[in-house]
Swiss-Prot record:
Protein name in the entry: Extracellular cysteine protease
Location of the active site: C24, H120, N141
SUPFAM superfamilies: Cysteine proteinases
Signal peptide stretch: none
Keywords for this protein: Cell wall, Hydrolase, Protease, Secreted, Thiol protease, Virulence, Zymogen
Gene Ontology annotations of biological process type: proteolysis
Annotated localization: Secreted, Cell wall; Secreted
PTM annotation, UniProt: Proteolytically cleaved.
Enzyme Commission identifier(s): 3.4.22.-
Disulfide bridge partners, by residue number: none
Length: 174
């Protein structure tokens, strides 16, 4: 793939991937805050422990987060996180990335609304123009060791296990 333009969060790195748990939002926020603060002090487990200090064992392993908890955590870390009831546009991603503001993707699985991964959070690492001007958004799925490119005109995200997620909302400002 030929990239004629790439705009990525300068310090975005994949430091950990999601195992058998429901912590996708923790992984997403950790990656975004580590990037925008240029640190490595955040990790998914500590984020989840901060938000659910009294859960233990199976209950802790399989707790997820609400969008309000994600907003609250971002704000507790000095960020003015905001909820957007839709996918962010290519131009919004470009501007937020340029301004070193991370974006979380909130997705609903298209195939089934049941099970451990019915809802899923992913991180926007930036945006690019590839293959003669096709606009794409660079997304990190916490299950994966690399970034994927998402057509900027589609809110349906195919992921590595074969499922598809509808990008129904965003939280930006991490």
């Amino acid at each position: 793939m030929y990239a004629e333009y790439v705009n990525q969060l300068k310090n975005f790195r994949i430091r950990e991937t999601q195992g058998y748990n429901s912590w996708c939002a923790g992984y997403t926020m950790s990656a975004l805050l580590n990037a925008t603060y240029n640190t490595n002090r955040y990790n998914a487990e500590s984020v989840m422990r901060y938000l659910h200090p009294n859960l233990r064992g199976h209950d802790f392993q399989f707790t997820g987060l609400t969008s309000n908890e994600m907003l609250r955590f971002g704000r507790s870390q000095g960020r003015n996180t905001q909820y957007l009831n839709r996918m962010t546009s290519y131009n919004e991603v470009d501007q937020l990335t340029t301004n070193n503001q991370g974006i979380a993707v909130l997705g609903k699985r298209v195939e089934s609304s049941d099970g451990i991964h019915a809802g899923h959070a992913m991180a926007v690492a930036g945006n690019a123009k590839v293959n003669n001007g096709q606009k794409v958004i660079l997304i990190w799925n916490p299950w994966d060791n690399g970034l994927m490119t998402q057509d900027a005109h589609s809110n349906i995200i195919p992921v590595s296990n074969g499922d598809h997620y509808e990008w129904y909302a965003s939280i930006y400002g991490y």
